[in-house]
């Protein structure tokens, strides 16, 4: 089969590799769409892979073409997405249902062959069937949707509250949608891109705020009557938005860092004191899994995509490119700010 193989730093080659087979308990999927995740970019451009050669890709969808012995959950012909985590299922964290925290895990697309290929194989339990009314493009967005929902579930999310979403990338837009689905009073999305903020409004945000404006904080607080936001979800992983989260939080709020920082993070004593004075809870969120594995995050994504309450917009996708152009796709990320949205690598029939 053909695959986009990372053979060296900044070197992705579309080449022939051995085609995997479905062993007992596993399924083989013909890949239709595979998204480039932000975590894949440093793997290709900054020596971030675990080993060479490696096939990346962990946000994907396709059709089941082969099932191994004993498989009962899915059948040949099913349209599926895939949960990429392969937890050990034996450690204390796994036994307690905290699969994201497993220290002995493997992972499709970083520690073993991923979905930037004609085919990928995954355990039966990692295959998430979805309704044929859901497109393959949507199916490739299951993983970022589940990351967003996991953040809400980590914070005992309740409706009827004001919610701030910091960052208007794919995960930020999904976080906004989940907050709306579960009954928020008002959801406000913050970003520096008018294009992305327009997308957030189309997708259902109650208000959007461009943080490059001089008086954006006054505008943000006025929406809540000066009380601040009961839930603040930081999805950008940027130092300014992490500072902003502390300032936007209401008394007794829940502040959740979903975004992963890539620079040193420092707070002034005054900034940090917000947490003391407001007595808010600061929580991290990692990946997207719960018990029973892979978790309600995945089941609910399939359900709400099928009902149409979880929405998809062409604006999610920056560009669709053939799998054979993976090298060119990753090169686009070298221009700061160029890629707005998801790049999907697709296979021709």
Predicted regions and their residues:
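C-terminal substrate-binding/catalytic core of Rossmann-like NAD(P)-dependent dehydrogenases/reductases
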Residues: 221-222, 226, 265-317, 328
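C-terminal hydrophobic helical "lid"/dimerization subdomain
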Residues: 3, 243-247, 296-349
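Mid-domain Rossmann-like dinucleotide-binding core that forms the NAD(H)/NADP(H) cofactor-binding site
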Residues: 134-214, 218
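Glycine-rich beta-strand-centered segment in the early N-terminal region that forms part
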Residues: 20-34, 47-92, 131-134
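Glycine-rich cofactor phosphate-binding loops and adjacent beta1-alpha1 units
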Residues: 155, 203-281, 338
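Short Gly/Pro-enriched turn/cap motifs at secondary-structure boundaries
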Residues: 7, 18-19, 51-57, 108-112, ...
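NAD(P)H dinucleotide-binding glycine-rich loop of Rossmann-like/cofactor-binding domains
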Residues: 88-166
